[in-house]
Amino acid sequence: MEFYGNNVGTYTTTAGQVGRNNGIKFTNTDKPEIGYSIGSIRATPYFFQLFEDDDERRDWSIADYEFTDEGEKKAISSNNMWIRFCGKFRREYELLTPKSTTNTSTNFPILRYSDVLLMYAEAVAADETSEAGELTQAYEYLNRVRRRGYGRDVNTPVMGVDLPEEGRISLLEAVKDERARELGHELLRKDDIIRWGEFYDRMQSVRVTVPEAYTSNYYCLLYTSPSPRD
């Protein structure tokens, strides 16, 4: 989704808030060059631990630094994953200036090629009638996504990065994790886990680990299908 302006100057109706709401928190308005952000999205230990250390997507999706009040980058040394912000939409790379405190021109992904590859792999994994050739192709598409994530050539097999072909069930579980790694913070995960019938169980697992301060003022008013088990 393309946003052309930032609500400053001529193009005032084509702006978004990508990075302003879901960037690395920085609220010192005296440093506009950094880019104001309320930092409303943080990581979870589950998400962080899905990545291997040499997966380049981890420290891009989950910021490994924060900003001081003066706009200096400060590395995060704590093992507390709850304090790490979404890093995928960083305002420091925003080209349109002056930067606004309310809107940005940062685009938001609607459909990426890696998503298409993973959709193919999932469709093959979910189909009991999938043929051997389709399964091989599905693993290849999955591994292309992984190779890119590790900074490797997408068309060249890489030992230690590529997943071996181990059947449909293993493929589906691998796709579930890979969609999180590749498409994190892109507003797809909820629909994914609803589609897999895992929404309720996953929310319950998060509920017992999330810091109490995050949930003390909220309570459930409705469930999202499929219906939760008793």
Residue ranges and their predicted role:
Residues 1, 5, 10-12, 53-225, ...:
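Acidic/polar-rich alpha-helix caps and helix-coil junctions
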Residues 43-44, 135:
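Residue-level signal for threonine
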Residues 1-41:
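Polar, glycine-rich mid-to-C-terminal structural blocks
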